[in-house]
Regions:
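AAA+/SF3 P-loop NTPase mechanochemical coupling elements
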Residues: 71-76, 110-128
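Phosphate-handling catalytic cores of nucleic-acid transaction enzymes
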Residues: 8, 28-32, 36, 49, ...
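DNA transaction DNA-binding modules
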Residues: 38-39, 186-360
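Conserved AAA+/SF3 P-loop NTPase catalytic/coupling segment centered on the Walker-B
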Residues: 79-102, 134-141
Length: 360
């Protein structure tokens, strides 16, 4: 329960994952378990349990180079591979190698002064890290299952001493092993791993470029979270809760470039690219020309749906629910009223269209 942070769904998946490793060792799961927490929360103790069950066919490495580097003999004759203090943030090449190791049925092993050779792989990979951001996790990731380990017993030496005593007690481990051997996993598919809140958080932390910028805009109800001395935020309806919400393409570009300079991490974007990206992140956005008191001339831009709808569309793109910043009751009322006005405008436009058809 400590590893699963008292989440029943997470606990069930982990127990069945371990049972699968016992009962169907020849069926490589294609999913790695990643444990994240502060130091002293029990990640190492979990490996002690794994080592007690699998013994000499388990290995703990403190340097991921022993697994993803040129010389990876540690993979030979080991079934459980536990990478302690693993961190792949900024290590794109290493991450790609790890992904291949997690899924490939045959992997290449290389020892010093020996020719590389291929072995059949049934490995179960585990990783533990104290870092808040383990690695760049893409939106469509299917190889990792993340666990936020509970800090309930953080640095509690007495508690973990008792756990270690239980693990060293052969009867306790034998009982647990018997349980795993006889657990019903007929309907369990390790590839259908659960999406934990930690998995969502890792994916959010991995957003970059315009995706990251758009996410921040959705979280902050608009683009005013960007600090700038330019007349950037004087455009009509820059607060997303005002309707109808129009944002000029040049405003989006300027806002993003300002955000880009602040972050100094994301690739720059051109105005012609915005349309394609907006359609992915917010399919309901309509490209239109708009003129207002603020604009001397008509400007090209986008009429965006309500904030709630825009968030829903981003969740669809993202593939799961997101914990958005709360909106006040007053803001909710404004949003509901804005949606009502938008619907009325649509009805008026439809009526006008039908009248024009009748006239013809």
């Amino acid at each position: 329960s400590i590893i699963s942070n008292n989440n029943q769904q997470s606990y069930d998946y982990l127990i069945q994952y371990l049972a699968h490793a016992i009962q169907k060792a020849e069926d490589k799961p294609g999913v790695a378990i990643v444990l994240l927490s502060d130091s002293g929360c029990g990640k190492g103790t979990f490996y002690t349990l794994l080592n007690k069950i699998w013994g000499r066919s388990s290995i703990e490495v403190n340097d991921v180079k022993h697994i993803i580097g040129n010389f990876n003999a540690a993979l030979q004759n080991n079934f459980i591979v536990f990478m302690d203090e693993a961190l792949f943030k900024g290590n794109h090449e290493g991450m790609e190698r790890l992904k291949n190791l997690i899924t490939e049925k045959t992997i290449r092993v290389e020892k010093k002064y020996m020719q590389a050779y291929d072995i059949e792989s049934f490995h179960r990979f585990f990783a533990a890290s104290n870092s808040e951001h383990f690695a760049h996790i893409p939106i469509d990731d299917r190889r990792f299952c993340f666990y936020r380990v509970s800090n309930q017993y953080k640095q509690n030496l007495d508690y973990f001493e008792k756990i270690h005593q239980l693990i060293e007690n052969g009867h306790q481990v034998q009982g647990f092993l018997h349980y795993l051997q006889h657990l019903d996993i007929k309907t369990f598919n390790p590839r259908s791993r659960i999406i934990t809140q930690e998995h969502i958080d890792q994916r959010i932390k991995s957003l970059k470029g315009f995706e990251r910028f758009w996410y921040e805009a959705l979280q902050n109800h608009g683009f005013s979270f960007i600090s700038t001395s330019h007349r950037l935020l004087t455009t009509d309806n820059i607060d997303w809760l005002e309707k109808p919400f129009f944002v000029a393409t040049e405003t989006l570009l300027l806002c993003f470039n300002q955000y880009d300079r602040q972050s100094q991490r994301y690739e720059s974007i051109q105005s012609q690219q915005i349309s394609k990206i907006i359609k992915k992140l917010c399919p309901d956005a309509n490209a239109i020309k708009h003129k207002s008191q603020t604009f001397e001339k008509e400007k090209r831009g986008y009429r965006l749906p309500g904030l709630f709808r825009a968030r829903q569309l981003f969740e669809t793109y993202f593939g799961c629910k997101i914990d958005w910043m709360q909106i006040t009751d007053t803001e909710i009322k404004l949003e509901i009223e804005a949606e009502r006005i938008a619907e009325s405008e649509q009805e008026i436009m439809l009526d006008a269209y039908h009248e024009s058809l009748d006239e013809t």
